[in-house]
Amino acid sequence: MNLFDFFRGRQKQTSASVAKERLQIIVAHERGQRSEPDYLPALQKELLEVIRKYVNIGNDDVHIELENQGSCSILELNITLPDR
């Protein structure tokens, strides 16, 4: 580093590093706005398979909702059972 670079401050970033930094910000922002975790669809599928062992239900008959209240997460499972 020469004396002029020291007084100019940081060197210019390359366009690749700027693009990478912007992409990281976008990904972090998208993750923060996501309301459901990654495992929720798989959990719904597995629960549906277990319930189908005992009751004949369709995919639309099971609704899973995850709600955050402070430091607690509440998993709500609603199953519409067929009439006997």
Swiss-Prot record:
Pfam families with a match to the protein in the record: MinE
Keyword set, alphabetical order: Cell cycle, Cell division
GO process terms (BP): cell division; regulation of division septum assembly
Superkingdom of the source species: Bacteria
Keyword Cell division: yes
SUPFAM superfamilies according to UniProt: Cell division protein MinE topological specificity domain (SSF55229)
Functional summary from the UniProt entry: Prevents the cell division inhibition by proteins MinC and MinD at internal division sites while permitting inhibition at polar sites. This ensures cell division at the proper site by restricting the formation of a division septum at the midpoint of the long axis of the cell.
Similarity remark: Belongs to the MinE family.
Protein name: Cell division topological specificity factor
Organism annotation: Pseudomonas putida (strain ATCC 47054 / DSM 6125 / CFBP 8728 / NCIMB 11950 / KT2440)
Lineage: Bacteria, Pseudomonadati, Pseudomonadota, Gammaproteobacteria, Pseudomonadales
